[in-house]
């Protein structure tokens, strides 16, 4: 064991269970309808539930500032799924471009560069309509997205329908 090492989770639970994650302006506010004032506590609750199924943590290999490959552990959530329903095509496109650029600059120790504040403002504003609940189905070693409930859902429209519609 080495300090700072991240390990994947082990399966402790069989079967499946639904997980409801509620976001307001892109921030996690409730887990299975239990509200949290502190987003860190909400994330810890998600980790507690997902860990039993061996999910929630993964590995990423990338390039480091000194030019060698590095491996890091990270945890991912349902936020991106909700964004697909509540952001337009171009909002998603530019958010992805800017987020990648921001991550690269941050990784290269450019946090104090003034443009970083501009990018943070853009990313923060992009979350104004990321409101609602993402519903996931958890199973051992995997999860799937089941649906979204949101007043800001761009799929539900009075204008018309295309493809499969969410009811």
Question: Language-model segments: which ranges?
Answer:
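Nucleotide-activated chemistry modules centered on ATP-dependent adenylation/adenylyltransferase
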Residues: 1-167
